[in-house]
Amino acid sequence: MSLLDELFPGIFNNEWEAIPKWENEDRPWELLSSRESGLISQISDYNEGEAFIHPEAIIGDFVRIEGPCYIGANAEVRHSAFLRKGSWICEGAVVGHSTEVKNSILLPGAKAPHFNYVGDSIIGIDANLGAGAKLSNVRNDRREVFVTLSDGERFGSGLRKFGALIGDNSQLGCNVVTNPGTIIAPGSMIAPNETMGGWVEVKS
């Protein structure tokens, strides 16, 4: 089983209207890189480098959108949200009030609804970030971000900017902070005010 399938099994449901394509399913974070097959390149294929906004998407007042980005059907981008270059907001996902998203994917039904920061990250299907949760994406020393897998293997990601992979149906409590390179297993329940790193699997 690939890491992509382990963390985001729901994406293999062919009913989704539009989700990114992964070249390396064992290193899903590579989609966040600037390579030709990367996220920004794929978004640009939809709308020549500008923002693609589905006619059924809901965009609130005072939202700032910087292309290229993709906003899918029935996605909701609420008042004063900030979508930076490389944001892919899949169908039914929510970007809430004063939330900032940068070079990241919210898979179908994912929610970053209140005062969140999502940097260089992938949030799984129906996963939810509690109010104030932050997915930090850069180490203080600006060096390469490392990842740890479920078997304890640790290695470099090849990226200096990489936030978190949040598995399908995971729930992060209010004010949770993830260190760069955090991987949260699907269905995990993270208590409020926690700082997380490495491989995380917390069941209720």
Question: Predicted segment positions?
Answer:
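Short-chain dehydrogenase/reductase
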Residues: 58, 76, 177, 189-190
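Flexible, glycine/small-residue-enriched loop-and-beta-strand segment within the central core
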Residues: 36, 65-72, 76-166, 172, ...
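Terminal amphipathic alpha-helical/low-complexity segments used for targeting or macromolecular assembly
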Residues: 1-50, 55-56, 182, 186-187, ...
